């Protein structure tokens, strides 16, 4: 449904740089509001820089990825870094009375921590894939049975934290 003009704290026209805004979707995740813009503009002409040859990628739990040329990408362990904070927030949530305002606030706090962890993972993977695509012409990655690895209770947490499924 249409709601008309939406006031934003950021300068939206400066953000889209002269492109025509086709659609704006407003959503709420983890207690925060987000606006997603769909814009229409001419395709930019980009000169392709010469790329290196082929590379193979070996995914792992200890190091996120090891490239065939010897480059090692460390695993940031996003969940492990926020686990203590998450544990404390879950504990506080469990102590709140069901249906209360404070329980809702505690739920939002847990959701915000989870959203921050997911955002860190997504950001790292976006930066890594952009760098790989810009650096190498051919990329080969091993085919993993992630569902099977997650079934192993010893590996599950580490595999999910490294976000192999993405």
Predicted regions and their residues:
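Extended, low-complexity cationic-aromatic segments
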Residues: 6
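Positively charged, helix-rich recognition surfaces that bind polyanionic ligands
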Residues: 1-2, 12-23, 28-166
């Amino acid at each position: 449904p249409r709601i008309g003009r939406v006031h934003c704290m950021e300068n939206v026209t400066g953000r889209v740089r002269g492109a025509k805004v086709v659609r704006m979707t407003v959503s709420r995740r983890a207690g925060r509001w987000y606006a997603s813009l769909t814009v229409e503009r001419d395709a930019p002409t980009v000169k392709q820089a010469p790329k290196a040859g082929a590379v193979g990628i070996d995914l792992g739990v200890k190091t996120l990825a090891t490239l065939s040329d010897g480059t090692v990408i460390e695993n940031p362990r996003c969940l492990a870094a926020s686990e203590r904070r998450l544990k404390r927030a879950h504990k506080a949530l469990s102590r709140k009375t069901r249906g209360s305002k404070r329980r809702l606030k505690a739920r939002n706090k847990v959701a915000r921590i989870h959203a921050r962890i997911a955002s860190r993972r997504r950001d790292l993977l976006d930066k890594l894939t952009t760098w790989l695509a810009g650096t190498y012409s051919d990329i080969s990655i091993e085919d993993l049975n992630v569902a099977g690895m997650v079934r192993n209770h010893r590996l599950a947490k580490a595999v999910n934290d490294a976000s192999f499924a993405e």
